[in-house]
């Protein structure tokens, strides 16, 4: 069991949900985002954005690794900073774009393969 923080653009809510389910069903503790403002049209203030960014770095601090939700290889500037931070802290880093998780992962895996 590992503690894994999901990192990536908030416009990829569905991919975050897939990654969260996949990694959780492997027996991991998954820490995700609080808001998906880009995919839900939710607006936050600059001060709130700064708070959420700082909290995300603390999430990385308590994690064993990060899982980057980089749909089609997209990595924005905030996610790039999170990756660099995780590297500096010696955290393992995995990427969604490596194909470990497909959109039908929960339908194709047998229960005994999940753990």
Located regions from the model:
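Conserved catalytic or regulatory cores that recognize and/or transform ribose-phosphate-containing ligands
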Residues: 1-115
